């Protein structure tokens, strides 16, 4: 065997290979440790969505003639979900094309080397096999798959469980519970004009993803609810969440130890959600740009305190673009004491005043509590007197 003088010797090559192999064996287990868990969860959830979309779509296509099905139900969900079993086939038709979906699942043995120890684990996998005539490949790839994604999104939204998230200063992360507030726009004691205005604004926001992208703005909307105590501000937030099927993130500014932690909390929220800051006038004393900032009690030494500038940057600045389909809601009983920077149109898109009950609102309450129709042609005999007393 002849070696070129430009090539390293066999001993050098073997030494390099041994070092490289040892380096790879050392790095491999470190990947699971170095990569943050949220990134791993994001990657896994992204991969899982490729299976979840066909699964949701096909759940509405399952034939009664299927020989074997799987039935599941989440403990927090009232809906029963039907899924295909191993090898079951579902037929579909799209623009005259016949397609067949087949569900497959299995398990593989995975070996992981950690230091000098070898760990073995069983990894379950599942997938859907889609078959069709190859002459329709372009239509299926460019049109049908997107159609399945859209239909699956609608089905998932109908079955979605709304959650209420709160920040835990003990675990330093968001914790959630199932949100079961019964408030809806139908039961809200609001004037019909205001109610329609809010609902139309929400509908317009949801449908304008392309518009926000075209004008170069973050896909978000902010609402400022103000009025006397007990006039339905929290109930309106619940009605908005139930109407849109959005999760709620209840942010207590008093528990936030600085601008950096506020940014981290907002980055940990999901899309299609509501960020709620209740009673912002009394939750924390936010120093303005002209006031010296003081460190929050209990904050780590050297940390940046929570400031009005930091809050505005997260709501309407560069950090507000980190996410899509977000809604921000501030509530207060005393609008006059807030800094004007929080109330400007660029920060709060819609101001909603919730005052004391009007006569129209009273009729809705009478319908809710007493079962009296509020739009009847034959109103109650006391309604004229009640209207006179409420209107003053």
From Swiss-Prot:
Q: Where in the cell is it found?
A: Membrane
Transmembrane spans? 13-35
Which Pfam families would you find in this protein's record? AAA (PF00004), AAA_assoc (PF14363)
The protein's matches in SUPFAM superfamilies, at most eight in alphabetical order, are given as: P-loop containing nucleoside triphosphate hydrolases (SSF52540)
Membrane topology category? Single-pass membrane protein
The answer to keyword Hydrolase applying to this record is yes
Q: Which residues bind ATP?
A: 227-234
- Chief subcellular location equals membrane
InterPro entries per UniProt: AAA+_ATPase (IPR003593), AAA_N_dom (IPR025753), ATPase_AAA_core (IPR003959), ATPase_AAA_CS (IPR003960), Mitochondrial_chaperone_BCS1 (IPR050747), P-loop_NTPase (IPR027417)
Which processes are annotated in GO (biological process)?
response to stress
Leader sequence range is none
**Recorded superkingdom:** Eukaryota
Q: Which reaction does it catalyse?
A: ATP + H2O = ADP + phosphate + H(+)
Q: Which GO terms describe its molecular function?
A: ATP binding; ATP hydrolysis activity
Per the UniProt entry, the Enzyme Commission number(s) are 3.6.1.-
Record's Gene Ontology CC terms?
membrane
Keyword field contains ATP-binding: yes
Cofactor(s) needed for function: Mg(2+)
**PROSITE patterns on file:** AAA
Q: Which UniProt keywords apply?
A: ATP-binding, Hydrolase, Magnesium, Membrane, Nucleotide-binding, Transmembrane, Transmembrane helix
Query: Mind telling me which PANTHER family this protein's record contains?
Result: BCS1 AAA-TYPE ATPASE
What family does this chain come from, according to its entry? Belongs to the AAA ATPase family. BCS1 subfamily.
Protein's UniProt name: AAA-ATPase At5g17750
Q: What is the lineage of its organism?
A: Eukaryota, Viridiplantae, Streptophyta, Embryophyta, Tracheophyta
